[in-house]
Swiss-Prot record:
Gene: trpD
Residue positions binding 5-phospho-alpha-D-ribose 1-diphosphate: 80, 83-84, 88, 90-93, 108-116, 120
UniProt protein name: Anthranilate phosphoribosyltransferase
Annotated Gene3D superfamilies: Nucleoside phosphorylase/phosphoribosyltransferase catalytic domain, Transferase, Pyrimidine Nucleoside Phosphorylase, Chain C
UniProt keyword list: Amino-acid biosynthesis, Aromatic amino acid biosynthesis, Glycosyltransferase, Magnesium, Metal-binding, Transferase, Tryptophan biosynthesis
Cofactor binding summary note: Binds 2 magnesium ions per monomer.
EC number from the UniProt entry: 2.4.2.18
Name of the top EC class for this enzyme: transferase
Organism lineage string: Bacteria, Pseudomonadati, Myxococcota, Polyangia, Polyangiales
């Protein structure tokens, strides 16, 4: 079967979502050799992945992930692909806590660093959080704190079969696109950053195929987030329709800032940065970068009439300093809840 698939891809033939889903279920089960995986990834990349192919791969991963009980209330995710190579501070993690403080719970799917010196998982771990509490503990955090972190390796163990190939290839493939698309909580609202501006609209259409109700996919001047230093190319998904947009910092009422103002450091420094920022002590460029991205999430979720209003709400939440308390509560719950779950399992 695989040779026929590779021949078709090399001839420029697109796969259906169902075909791609079946292939990725084989990947997850460890049924494909490293040579077959290499050929599949490279052939898809050379042809150019379609929204249907990406959606099929994402469905396979969602369908085989560790289950997470979806809440009935509205919640969201803000996650980027990484891979932009810019080594900026970990904006998306701060965005999640700010959005939660503004009333929008966030189930953040994430991993360790891809393009920066510190990913979401690295920063939270440096703050003392447990990355791998049981799913029910994470759901409790979402309910009680308005934030939970779903660590990708914990929920998608089958992806380990692709790691040797990804390390050997050292090029971007469909695997680099999938992280933000396979949140096991299947959030109805999402802001997704992407490393390639040419994939912005593709990704928005893919989210629609996956059942996302409202989304914004962004690439800002080389960053997988809304930028302060350049216009941001965006695609908004609403009611099944994708609309292309261009976002300028002035649209949100914040000042431009050079990308150099957002350069990051290692986990310990990022943890301190995150704590200070959420306590209302962030540098202006850091504050505005987080606010415009949190504002986009609040806008897309319907908590604000537009980006400017959403950004103002985010700035208010940042200024209050209360998001830092939310961070402290999450760290404690992730650690203590995991310990309680282990004790119950031991005595149960």
């Amino acid at each position: 079967m695989m040779h026929a698939v590779i021949d078709a891809l090399c001839a420029g033939v697109d796969l259906s979502a169902e075909q791609t889903e079946a292939l990725f279920r084989d990947l997850i089960a460890g049924a494909l050799t490293e040579i077959e995986l290499s050929a599949l990834f490279v052939a898809l990349k050379a042809k150019g992945e379609t929204p249907a192919e990406i959606a099929g791969a994402a469905r396979a991963l969602r369908g085989t992930s560790v289950p997470f009980a979806r809440p009935a209330y509205v919640y969201a995710d803000c996650c980027g692909t990484g891979g932009d190579g810019q080594s900026t501070v970990n904006v998306s993690t701060a965005v999640a806590f700010v959005a939660a403080e503004a009333g929008l719970p966030v189930a953040k799917h994430g991993n360790r660093s891809v393009s920066s010196q510190c990913g979401s998982a690295d920063a939270l771990e440096a703050l003392g959080a447990r990355l791998d509490p049981p799913a029910e503990v994470s759901r409790r955090a979402l309910d009680e704190v308005g934030f939970c972190f779903l660590f990708a390796p914990q929920y998608h163990a089958g992806l380990r079969h692709a790691m040797p190939v990804r390390r050997a290839l050292k090029v971007r493939t469909i695997m680099n696109l999938l992280g933000p698309l396979v949140n096991p909580s299947a959030p109805p609202i999402q802001v997704m950053g992407i490393y390639d501006p040419e994939l912005v609209t593709h990704a928005a259409r893919t989210l629609g195929m996956l059942g996302c109700q409202a989304a914004l996919v962004v690439h800002g001047g080389g960053l997988d987030e809304v930028a302060l230093h350049a216009p941001t190319r965006a695609a908004r998904l609403r009611d099944g329709v994708v609309e292309e947009l261009l976002i300028d910092p002035a649209d949100a009422g914040v000042a431009p800032a050079p990308i150099e103002a957002l350069r990051g450091a290692g986990p310990a420094a990022n943890a301190a940065w995150l704590r200070d920022l959420l306590a209302g002590r962030g540098a202006p460029a850091h504050r505005d970068a987080v606010a415009i991205n949190a504002g986009a999430l609040l806008w897309i979720a319907g908590r604000a009439e537009g980006l400017r209003e959403g950004t103002a709400l985010a700035l208010e939440a940042l200024g209050s300093g209360r998001a830092a308390e939310r961070l402290t509560r999450f760290v404690a719950l992730s650690r203590d809840g995991a310990q309680e779950a282990r004790k119950e399992a031991k005595h149960g």
